[in-house]
Amino acid sequence: VVMVQKEVAERICAKPPRMSLLSVAVQYYGEPRIVARVPAGAFWPRPKVDSAVVAITPQHPSTQAPEHLVETEHFFRVVRAGFSQKRKQLWHNLSAGLQLDPINVKAVLKEVAGNEKIRAEELTVEQWKQVLRCWGAQVLK
């Protein structure tokens, strides 16, 4: 449980199409939810922003089916590449950032998301995992 600025709490708990590297990172490890909003007037001296309390329910690997597990280091390597240039289409960021064939990247995105022109902020955490599973060891090079 943490208290952060309201805007940060909203970014942590975001769903597609408003995902960010922060929301993907937190949601990889657990399920966040805003449990309370705290107005700026509740503090002295009064800050310029409202706050929110975020509770994160951890997701332990032992509770996940084996087909849903991915290597953490590789997962974040792919996600960081995907969010490297926010307004670019995801296939461009992944092919450039991971030195992968653009045609292969587009095919995987079409399979996972149904759209090869998707942007990073439009994928769920599970879809990011599916992308990584489709490539397997290919992105480890």
Protein language model regions, located:
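Class I S-adenosyl-L-methionine
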Residues: 1-120, 130-141
